[in-house]
Amino acid sequence: MRLKHPTARLALAALLVAVPRSVAAAGTVHAAPAPAGATRLAAVGLDDPHKKDIAMQLVSSAENSSLDWKSQYKYIEDIKDGRGYTAGIIGFCSGTGDMLDLVADYTDLKPGNILAKYLPALRKVNGTESHAGLASAFEKDWATAAKDSVFQQAQNDERDRSYFNPAVNQAKASLRALGQFAYYDAIVMHGPGDSSDSFGGIRKAAMKKAKTPAQGRDEATYLKAFLAARKTVMLKEEAHSDTSRVDTEQTVFLNAKNFDLNPPLKWKVYGDSYAINS
């Protein structure tokens, strides 16, 4: 994932790593109140189409300083973060593998497309910041491909497969839409691995501080621990040192107890104000 704002950077490679879901707390012989997480089952999750669109707008406000995420299919540039080109709706990167996967999938769907000829170059530059075999011609052809609905769908599919679905699936057992979004935004920026600075590491650090709702702890306490763990990781890197997407976005929703992420929503990212009214 890319961050176009000068204080932010792209996420790590999109290599799916399964993270175990929390196990629900066992019941007792005597009747007892259900854990806070149990009430979430009746709520609308982030995979609801409208909620998903809200999530994309929230991410786009930080990534592109715009709520119009559907205008980002054509986006491509080198943001000088050591990961080569950053492009598309969630910043697929030539240096981290997900751009290669995307173009390969697009070619499976539409052989002979305008980007297919760059697959050999994308394989060579994977893991580097190099533009070898790409450069301005690739940028132009990417923008052309972005007009193709098949390529747009390929971007949507790669987003879901590598970022959105893993985040939501790992949150569903315990967290409502806000918590699911917190996972998604984290996996977008930090990658889905298990290292201490990845989503998996952040989640593990949070769970050492607070149990999940499925384990009997209230949702707010766990989410505060998760956001605090994420901030700790962000502050270790200069490129992530502006933590406003946590402080003046997600924490604002949490303090308002808007666990279902219901509009109207008002927040700030990097000092810019945004609103979703419906």
Curated annotation (Swiss-Prot):
The active site is at E63 (proton donor), D81 (nucleophile). Its EC number is 3.2.1.132. One of its GO terms (cellular component) is extracellular region. It is found in: Secreted. One of its GO terms (biological process) is carbohydrate metabolic process. The keyword Signal applies. InterPro entries: Glyco_hydro_46, Glyco_hydro_46_N, Lysozyme-like_dom_sf. PROSITE patterns: CHITOSANASE_46_80. GO terms for molecular function: chitosanase activity. Gene3D superfamilies: Chitosanase, subunit A, domain 1, Chitosanase, subunit A, domain 2. Belongs to the glycosyl hydrolase 46 family. This is Chitosanase. It comes from Nocardioides sp. (strain N106).
